[in-house]
Amino acid sequence: MNIVSDVNYATSVAALRMLQASAVLDVTEEDFDFLTGDKIWIATDRNRARRCVEACVYGTLDFVGYPRFPAPVEFIAAVIAYYVHPVNVQTACLVMEGAEFSENIINGVERPVNAAELFAYTLRIKAGFKETVMDAEENARQKLRANGLK
């Protein structure tokens, strides 16, 4: 790995820690089951899939009524690695393509990633966070239950 990859990976570690600490997911239990479930998303699920992933990315902002701002690839990939069932990871990357790495956002460089790049980066995250990702669904379900959702 080069220095940029190390920085990107460290950014994803920080994103994953934020996800774990956050109790705010702006999704219903039905949408959470859709997001984390093993049912393969089909073409007609595209809008719902994007809405569900975005709800996890922007949940806190949406909950308090603040406007959204573009999330970096590292955060979106962490959300996909953390919440989306493996059978739907490629589809999630397809519907979420177009984000940019944090380094590019900071430097004002416009270079959106495509689905293949987002997928490759998500795989890198899943490889590095195996134990954390494996426990993600139960962790999130416990938080939903604690907030009164079943």
Swiss-Prot record:
InterPro entries: Scaffold_D (IPR004196), Scaffold_D_sf (IPR036632)
Subcellular locations according to the entry: Host cytoplasm
Record protein name field: External scaffolding protein D
UniProt keyword list: Host cytoplasm, Viral capsid assembly, Viral release from host cell
Annotated GO CC locations: host cell cytoplasm
Family: Belongs to the microvirus D protein family.
Lineage of the organism: Viruses, Monodnaviria, Sangervirae, Phixviricota, Malgrandaviricetes
GO BP terms: viral procapsid maturation
Subunit structure: Component of the procapsid particle composed of 60 copies of the internally located B, 240 copies of the external scaffolding protein D, 60 copies of each of the viral structural proteins F and G, and 12 copies of protein H.
UniProt source species: Escherichia phage alpha3
Chief location of this protein within or outside the cell: host cell
Function of the molecule: Assembles the procapsid by joining twelve 12S pre-assembly complex into a T=1 icosahedral particle, called 108S procapsid. Ten proteins D bind each 12S complex, which are formed by three pentamers of F, G, B protein and a H protein. The scaffolding protein is released from the provirion after genome packaging to form the mature virion.
Gene giving rise to this polypeptide: D
Listed Pfam families: gpD
Taxonomic superkingdom: Viruses
